[in-house]
Amino acid sequence: GLNAIVRVDPRTDRVRRFPLPEGRRFANLNTATLDRRGMLWFTGQSGVIGRLDPQSGQMQVWDAPRGRGPYGIATAPDGTVYFASLAASYVGRIDIDTGGVTVLEPPTARQGARRVWPDSRGRIWVSEWNAGRLGMYDPAGGRWREWRLPGDNPMPYAVYVDDRDTVWLSD
């Protein structure tokens, strides 16, 4: 692949490539989200998270706390950025000033947190691929809740919360 973030401006047809820094190639880039300041945050399954300033082109990349696995990423209504680590089975809360990560442990071990999505109240919903569960982290109280999904072998891939706070999963 390109080992880069690419921006396409449909108004001007301009395509701009933002390459990963030397030494960070082959990050296996996955998902991106914008924070309130307009910075683009992204994950790499090879064990990185990163931030791109689209105006200056400056990119910073940090090692994820537990190595391989960063996958889905999303921005909560309060501007906090969260990501899921599929291989390392946790949710990370990113300090958008420093790139530091606070690890949030879902109740089920080795659940395979794959994607995250916030609701309007700032709760973070998590598709737990390996466990066949839906998780929800409430940062207001630091509490988790989980639901077992129906069927013999559920494997929720993505989670999405609509504007009415209804939670949707694809499996």
Regions found by a protein language model. Name each.
Residues 23-37, 66-78, 108-121, 152-164, ...:
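Beta-rich, blade/repeat-based domains predominating
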Residues 3-7, 47-51, 89-93, 132-136:
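A short loop-to-beta-strand structural motif that recurs across blades of beta-propeller domains
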Residues 1-2, 40-46, 81-87, 124-130, ...:
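Conserved beta-strand positions in repeat-built beta-propeller and related beta-rich domains
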Residues 22-23, 48, 89, 108-109, ...:
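A short acidic/small-residue loop/turn micro-motif
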Residues 14-21, 58-63, 100-106, 143-149:
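A short beta-strand motif characteristic of beta-propeller blades
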Residues 1-4, 25-36, 42-48:
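A generic tandem-repeat structural signature
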Residues 9-13, 53-57, 95-99, 138-142:
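Short loop/turn segments that connect beta-strands within beta-propeller blades
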